């Protein structure tokens, strides 16, 4: 906050922020004729879209006082966008302007009364936001004066001609030192104590309490050759302090952190041991296999596709991805021998050997797999330490953006050191200084509660130059990428660029190199993005850009990016220069699923990019399933409707190049890859303005979505339609989340770590428990059926836990890996041709499993569906028509059903492994079945190991883990969600649990609750009133289940969250509403819609022998029946005989569009707004009629309709609807609008 005073003495409290799209109207209102003469006639939206930095100044009422826009190339066309440096160097050789330290002002507007103060405040903010910036140029016609405002901050340096017409333009310059100067750094003196202590006390009092009031003076006095204290000063006053020491505990750092890329922070020594002989031989064989030809990588893929165990597959895939990420981040740190300017001492060689390095972003790219027997080779460095450390650092908040000014001086104090390190508690918010450091990745076994940051002396160089690659750069690039798995692909693209500048198919190709001191330290290869229509229609790219303001050729597809980690802090600058030099405005980077990335040397293989954390992940868009045959020529183009290989999309553009992200280093551990856990992670990952460095998932089988089962195969388990394999590919959570494969067996709340089954520990700051409930191995009652016992005579074993060895042919299917194991067992043991299969349970998964077995070729006569007594009167399908059709299909297939049967014994009470027979009791007489394979789908429960871990940790557990309405357990650091949990008894709502709601919505709400801890842009959470504190939240998302049932019936059931109640009881209620049914369940044409008393769609049930677009039907939930083309009236008039056909008609496709909800909100906002001064809004009129404040002579509906049609509201609604259709015409070309009819 700053205070501006006008010449008249008026005062305004102002602050700066990034310009937003809604500012455009106010910016236009501040433009004067003089503004147009200075800057030209501008399209403000277009200018903001292409700007690198746009700053708005607001007062405390959020009224816009001023705005300025800056780009990285000059306006008025006085120089080419990609070649302005030489022009401005010739103008004044004393101004060392470079693309790194220069911006150009393309617009400035302000409220006249405060314009001078606004201008200075904006410039100070810009220089603070961009520490590398030293010069801002302003170019205006030479005949124009700058006016009374700009002339106070800009000085003319010369004239320059225009390239397109004969006119000269005056060049003015604004220097950093006039607004936010570099800090003077010197050795500390004792007299600095009084200046510095208030700054220290502002942040922390622990040092004073621990070491006494004069600890700082004592530290300054204790300086020697190994310890130095330095300060930065402004006008003779110390405003910052840094204490550095040459003594570093290298042994501890080598034990805890992977320091491979920097040679262990040591000088090279002949006796260094950089790799074990075994690893060396393995690496050589891998290199020969992977780099010789694409056949080698194909071989790996084929091996992965063989029927191996899921555990083995996860480990293989994780290791391949991890090695690729390690080698990518290595990027040629053999950039030793960098010849430096005279003011920096020549660097020693940096030897990487064969050490592997996981950069922050690279670590996120690879799954962190804990193998069963982890064996880690640690390099041994025998050379002297090449690092010094920062022991204490503090700086006044006003000057923290200049923190890096310390580094030149402290490196001069240690002329024999190449590295500066600092260790910080990992919860320390990321401050300006460490944003320039490289965060090192700890080893899996590291328990140090500190993060290590490293900065290399060469990182101080400002002479980095980004340019197009040339043929002479090839040796330097080869040296840079020699350790990359994809080096062959990069070098091939570079060679293609040098020879033809394009691909054989004509796609434009561009290659850029980053050069420091005549050495190549970075390489990037981009192509023109040819699938931009597909990207626009399948990804929410318009969250970041106004698509219409970007030309087709301005979209670039980044294929390769590698940068020496020493210069990691120049990554954004590298990306910015790629956009400027390549005449691009947007860059896209694709991450393909692992199965595709495994083919390292093929067209789909992109090099893993260390720039990933500087890009933003783009959410995929929900797609309409089009009836293409019915639409004919009105169908969307093939560029929109095609379904190529799914990939996750990452993006950057000119606006984002100077946009900082909020970094969160808190260790957030999610236990369980359930739909709730995945939804939670998805929400955090797609917060584009935030970067979570320590997201970890602990899961028995790692991330889901491995596509172990072919798409064409029947699924053993029913689906909740939260996520599918394509969704996982589109998210690419493995790019952002560390995955630990293991089971949680304990929680140490005091030490804040999770204990795994392998005795590994995973520390946490926030623990999220989403393990859900799983099918358990049933515990036989051990009743002797020879005694002819009935169910009433046997003990209830439902609460008992099976503790024996699980038989090898017994299967409880909880996730895809379990289904894959079952499938392999069926194939390897000839189950499809011989032996009985028992499916035990009464959930919907029993039906989908039976259908899968039938589809695999198992004869129905050998399948026995045994259903235990139901726990309630509500069946899993809760619809007699569907149940009857499924029962008939089971009978027709020859499947035998047994009802109310309780498992008594396996193998007549003998050793149960493997199971040869199973005995059951019933209400009448017992029976015994031969068994080759046993599937158990008894009631789900919390896994015993999970329960024991929770119970031992003293978390409150009452049949489930107890939480409050904010997901908290009795430990503030531990949250939980999903079917694992129940609400505390103080809410008096035991019937309602998270199981009643959509898992995806629960995960989203959990993430939203946690984001308030990390995101300063969110409004603070207000405490609910005392009387509302005892109410549980009610979520509105639909609860969905679906699958393929016996008879090859495709089944889908969508309903609002509710306490389960028999359908017949629901329909007997007087306010039930309407039931619309077409078709017959037994014929496979059944479609049922329940419309509630408010005329809203509340339930949808589909049963069809033909596949149907389930994702379309899910969008119908919660819609008003009139929105469905007066559904009820048409049904009553017998105009609808087939709802399947009805919802494939072209008129309804807009309902399935992902942005239709936005249109509804916009239209509602129009009706709620007062468009005419003296008249109430339509919404107010409706309330007045309801409250009987007005009594129209006609029916209320007719009255409102007449008012609507006679007022401006009708025109506004029609215009908004037509705008929606026009803007989304690539998805909705089947609709007509004025001009095409």
Swiss-Prot record:
Biased amino acid composition, Basic and acidic residues: 281-290
Location(s) in or outside the cell: Cytoplasm, Cytoskeleton, Flagellum axoneme
Organism domain of life: Eukaryota
Location, primary (coarse class): cytoplasm
Cellular component terms (Gene Ontology): axoneme; motile cilium; sperm flagellum
Gene3D superfamilies listed in its UniProt record: FAD/NAD(P)-binding domain
Any single biological process term in GO: cilium movement
SUPFAM superfamilies according to UniProt: FAD/NAD(P)-binding domain (SSF51905)
Disordered, as annotated region: 278-301
Pfam families documented for this protein: CFAP61_dimer, CFAP61_N
InterPro entries in UniProt: CFAP61 (IPR038884), CFAP61_dimer (IPR056299), CFAP61_N (IPR032151), FAD/NAD-bd_sf (IPR036188)
Keyword vocabulary terms for this entry: Cell projection, Cilium, Cytoplasm, Cytoskeleton, Disease variant, Flagellum
Its biological purpose: Involved in sperm flagellum assembly. Plays an essential role in the formation of the radial spokes in flagellum axoneme.
Known disease link: Spermatogenic failure 84: An autosomal recessive male infertility disorder characterized by multiple morphologic abnormalities of the sperm flagella, resulting in severely reduced motility. Some patients also have a reduced sperm count.
Subunit structure: Component of axonemal radial spokes, the protein complexes that link the outer microtubule doublets with the central pair of microtubules. Interacts with CFAP91/MAATS1, ODAD2/ARMC4, RSPH3A, ROPN1, ROPN1L and RSPH9. Interacts with DYNLT1, DYNC1I2 and TUBB3. Interacts with WDR35, IFT22 and IFT81.
Record-given protein name: Cilia- and flagella-associated protein 61
Organism annotation: Homo sapiens (Human)
């Amino acid at each position: 906050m700053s205070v501006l005073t006008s010449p008249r003495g008026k005062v305004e409290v102002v602050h700066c922020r990034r310009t937003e799209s809604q500012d455009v109207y106010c910016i236009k209102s501040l433009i004067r004729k003089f503004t147009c003469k200075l800057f030209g006639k501008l399209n403000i939206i277009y200018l903001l879209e292409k700007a690198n930095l746009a700053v708005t100044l607001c007062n405390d009422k959020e009224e816009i006082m001023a705005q300025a826009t800056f780009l990285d190339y000059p306006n008025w066309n006085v120089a080419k966008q990609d070649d302005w440096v030489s022009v401005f160097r010739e103008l004044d050789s004393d101004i060392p302007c470079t693309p790194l330290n220069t911006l150009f002002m393309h617009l400035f507007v302000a409220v006249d009364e405060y314009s001078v103060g606004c201008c200075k405040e904006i410039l100070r903010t810009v220089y603070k936001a961009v520490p590398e910036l030293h010069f801002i140029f302003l170019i205006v016609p030479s005949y124009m004066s700058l006016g009374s405002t700009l002339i106070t901050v800009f000085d003319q340096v010369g004239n320059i001609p225009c390239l397109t017409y004969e006119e000269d333009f005056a060049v003015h310059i604004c220097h950093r030192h006039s607004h936010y100067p570099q800090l003077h750094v010197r050795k500390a003196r004792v007299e600095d104590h009084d200046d510095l202590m208030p700054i220290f006390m502002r942040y922390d009092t622990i040092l004073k309490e621990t070491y006494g009031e004069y600890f700082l003076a004592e530290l300054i006095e204790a300086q020697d050759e190994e310890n130095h204290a330095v300060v930065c000063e402004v006008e003779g006053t110390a405003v910052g302090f840094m204490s550095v020491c040459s003594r570093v505990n290298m042994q501890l750092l080598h034990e805890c952190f992977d320091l491979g890329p920097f040679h262990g922070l040591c000088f090279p020594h002949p006796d260094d041991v950089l790799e074990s002989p075994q690893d060396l031989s393995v690496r050589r064989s891998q290199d020969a296999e992977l780099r010789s030809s694409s056949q080698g990588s194909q071989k790996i893929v084929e091996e992965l596709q063989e029927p191996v165990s899921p555990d083995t597959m996860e480990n293989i895939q994780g290791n391949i991805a991890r090695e690729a990420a390690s080698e990518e981040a290595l990027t040629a740190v053999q950039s030793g021998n960098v010849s430096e300017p005279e003011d920096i001492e020549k660097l020693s060689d940096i030897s990487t050997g064969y050490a592997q390095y996981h950069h922050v972003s690279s670590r996120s790219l690879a799954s962190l797999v804990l193998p069963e027997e982890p064996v880690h080779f640690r390099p041994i460095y025998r050379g002297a330490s090449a690092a010094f450390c920062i022991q204490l650092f503090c700086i006044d908040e006003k000057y923290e953006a200049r923190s890096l000014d310390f580094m030149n001086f402290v490196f001069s104090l240690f002329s024999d050191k190449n590295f500066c390190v600092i260790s910080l508690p990992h919860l320390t918010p990321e401050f300006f200084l460490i944003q320039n450091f490289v965060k090192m990745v700890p080893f899996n076994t590291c328990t140090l509660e500190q993060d290590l940051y490293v900065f290399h002396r060469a990182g101080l160089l400002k002479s980095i130059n980004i340019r197009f690659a040339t043929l002479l750069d090839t040796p330097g690039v080869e040296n840079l990428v020699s350790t990359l798995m994809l080096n062959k692909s990069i070098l091939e693209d570079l060679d293609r660029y040098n020879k033809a500048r394009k691909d054989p198919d004509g796609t434009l190709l561009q290659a850029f190199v980053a050069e420091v001191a005549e050495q190549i330290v970075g390489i990037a290869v981009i192509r023109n993005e040819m699938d931009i229509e597909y990207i626009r229609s399948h990804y929410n790219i318009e969250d970041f850009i106004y698509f219409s303001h970007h030309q087709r050729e301005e979209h670039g597809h980044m294929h390769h990016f590698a940068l020496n980690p020493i210069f990691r802090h120049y990554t954004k600058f590298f990306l910015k220069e790629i956009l400027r030099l390549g005449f691009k405005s947007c860059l896209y980077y694709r991450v393909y699923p692992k199965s595709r990335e495994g083919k390292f040397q093929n067209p789909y293989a992109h090099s893993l990019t260390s720039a990933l954390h500087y890009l933003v992940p783009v959410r995929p868009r929900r797609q309409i399933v089009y009836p293409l045959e019915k639409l004919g020529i009105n169908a969307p183009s093939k560029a929109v409707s095609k379904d190529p290989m799914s990939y996750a999309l990452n993006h950057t553009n000119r606006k984002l190049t100077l946009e900082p992200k909020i970094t969160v280093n808190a260790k957030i551990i999610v236990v369980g890859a359930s739909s709730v856990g995945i939804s939670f992670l998805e929400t955090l990952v797609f917060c584009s303005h935030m970067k979570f460095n320590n997201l970890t998932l602990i899961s028995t089988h790692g991330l889901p979505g491995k596509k172990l089962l072919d798409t064409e195969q029947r699924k053993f388990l029913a689906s909740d339609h939260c996520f599918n394999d394509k969704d996982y590919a589109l998210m690419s959570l493995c790019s952002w989340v560390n995955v630990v494969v293991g089971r949680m067996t304990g929680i140490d709340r005091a030490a804040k770590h999770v204990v795994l089954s392998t005795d590994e520990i995973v520390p946490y700051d926030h623990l999220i428990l989403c393990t859900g409930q799983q099918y358990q191995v049933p515990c036989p009652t051990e009743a002797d059926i020879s005694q002819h016992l009935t169910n009433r005579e046997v003990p209830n074993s439902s609460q008992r836990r099976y503790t024996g060895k699980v038989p090898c042919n017994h299967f409880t299917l909880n996730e895809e890996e379990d289904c894959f194991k079952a499938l392999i067992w069926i194939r390897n043991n000839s189950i499809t041709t011989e032996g009985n299969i028992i499916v035990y349970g009464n959930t919907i998964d029993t039906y989908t499993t039976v259908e899968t077995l039938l589809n695999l070729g198992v004869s129905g006569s050998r399948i026995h569906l045994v259903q235990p007594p139901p726990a309630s009167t509500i069946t899993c399908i809760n619809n007699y028509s569907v149940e009857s059709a499924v029962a008939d299909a089971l009978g027709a297939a020859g499947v035998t059903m047994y009802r109310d049967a309780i498992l008594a014994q396996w193998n007549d009470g003998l050793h149960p492994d493997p199971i040869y027979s199973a005995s059951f009791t019933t209400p009448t007489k017992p029976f015994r079945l031969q068994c080759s394979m046993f599937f158990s789908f008894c009631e789900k429960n919390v896994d015993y190991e999970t329960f024991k871990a929770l119970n031992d940790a003293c978390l409150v557990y009452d049949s489930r883990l107890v939480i409050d309405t904010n997901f908290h357990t009795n430990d503030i650091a531990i949250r939980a969600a999903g079917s694992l949990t129940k609400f505390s008894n103080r809410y008096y709502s035991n019937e309602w649990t998270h199981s009643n709601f959509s898992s995806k919505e629960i995960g989203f709400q959990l993430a939203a609750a946690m984001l308030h801890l990390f995101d300063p842009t969110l409004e603070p959470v207000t405490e609910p009133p005392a009387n509302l504190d005892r109410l549980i939240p009610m979520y509105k998302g639909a609860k969905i289940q679906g699958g393929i049932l016996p008879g090859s019936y495709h089944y889908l059931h969508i309903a609002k969250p509710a306490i389960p109640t028999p359908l017949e009881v629901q329909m007997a209620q007087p306010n039930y509403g309407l039931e619309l049914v077409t078709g017959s369940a037994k014929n496979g044409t059944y479609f049922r819609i329940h419309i509630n008393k408010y005329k809203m769609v509340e339930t949808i049930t589909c049963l069809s022998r033909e596949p149907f677009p389930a994702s379309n039907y899910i969008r119908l939930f919660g819609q008003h029946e009139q929105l469905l083309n007066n559904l009820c009236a048409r049904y009553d008039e017998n105009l609808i005989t087939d709802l399947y056909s009805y919802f494939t008609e072209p008129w309804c496709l807009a309902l399935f569009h992902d942005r239709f909800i936005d249109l509804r909100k916009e239209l509602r906002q129009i009706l709620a707004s007062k468009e005419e001064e003296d008249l109430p809004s339509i919404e107010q009129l409706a309330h007045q009629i309801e409250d009987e404040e007005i009594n129209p002579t006609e029916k209320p509906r007719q009255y409102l309709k007449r008012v609507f049609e006679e007022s401006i509201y009708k025109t506004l609604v029609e215009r908004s609807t037509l705008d929606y259709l026009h803007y989304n015409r690539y998805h909705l070309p089947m609709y007509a609008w004025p001009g095409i009819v």
